[in-house]
Amino acid sequence: LKKSILTLCGMVENAVADAVDAVMTSDRKKAEAVIDNDIEIDHFELDVEEECLKILALHQPVAGDLRYVIACLKMNNDLERIGDLAVNIAKRALSFYSIPTAEMPVNLRPLCECTKNALGKSLDALIRLDADLAAAGLAYDDVIDEMNRENHAKLLGLMHQHPENVERYLNLLNVSRHLE
């Protein structure tokens, strides 16, 4: 079960990183790959859920083991949802295909890195059953929220200054929100 959750996490982390990279570089192929690969994440999520349900049905875990399997079920669902958010980001990237990267008004890479770090620490906490690691993952939340607020404020200002680019700025706002 641990190996399956780690594999799914790796798939999702790659999808998020590739989706953000597609936005930042207007890389159409990378965006399309993220969208196409989502079916693999969806299938893997179903496999992990089935594995968890088999453990519950066949082994009837109790106490700590039961909590662990339930936590894996929840994490599995959350990872699939994050994969779907990566697809949403990739779809936004397709709208930037014709925009030169030098004109990107916000840098989403730091937000992406913080999000990946928070996700990684949270997963490590689950796998190792480590409350300190869980707290370290939560510590990123305020930083991520602040980065999203900064992007939001900057993009709203740009919308007022350049109303002809409102759709583009709204797409970037959504990307930032999805990362948050």
Question: Model-derived features: where do they sit?
Answer:
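Cytosolic, long alpha-helical scaffolding segments
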Residues: 1-180
